[in-house]
Curated annotation (Swiss-Prot):
Belongs to the universal ribosomal protein uL23 family. InterPro entries: Nucleotide-bd_a/b_plait_sf (IPR012677), Ribosomal_uL23-like (IPR013025), Ribosomal_uL23/eL15/eS24_sf (IPR012678). The keyword Cytoplasm does not apply. It comes from the Bacteria. GO terms for molecular function: rRNA binding; structural constituent of ribosome. Keywords: Ribonucleoprotein, Ribosomal protein, RNA-binding, rRNA-binding. Part of the 50S ribosomal subunit. Contacts protein L29, and trigger factor when it is bound to the ribosome. It holds the Pfam family Ribosomal_L23. One of its GO terms (cellular component) is ribonucleoprotein complex. SUPFAM superfamilies: Ribosomal proteins S24e, L23 and L15e. GO terms for biological process: translation. This is Large ribosomal subunit protein uL23. One of the early assembly proteins it binds 23S rRNA. One of the proteins that surrounds the polypeptide exit tunnel on the outside of the ribosome. Forms the main docking site for trigger factor binding to the ribosome.
């Protein structure tokens, strides 16, 4: 059951200009993760899925934007983002992850 939980930790890679620059320069991958996970869960999931060594993990909560149409006001969901810094010599191919 623990392995099944680790497979659900990572939702998707966060693809943006900033994350692609971080991957090229500093060997950092940026991931969207489930809101309730801890750094240890993220560490185990990334190590298991990609077979890499991790140097450091930074996690932050991204608050949802307020969106409105005419008189209705709504909010997008909050989500968690993880910056995973890999040790030297390890790389991750994010193109295979998106499939």
């Amino acid at each position: 059951m623990y392995i099944e939980r680790l497979l659900k930790v990572i939702k998707a890679p966060h693809v943006s200009e900033k994350s692609s620059i971080a991957l090229d320069k500093n060997n950092v991958i940026v991931l969207k993760v489930v809101n309730y996970v801890t750094k240890q869960d993220i560490r185990h999931a990334v190590c298991m899925l990609f077979s890499v060594k991790i140097k450091k993990i930074n996690v932050l909560m991204v608050s949802g934007k307020s969106k409105g149409q005419r008189y209705n006001l709504g909010y997008r969901c909050n989500w968690k983002k993880a910056y995973v810094i890999l040790k030297r010599g390890y790389t991750v191919d994010l193109m295979n992850m998106e499939q």
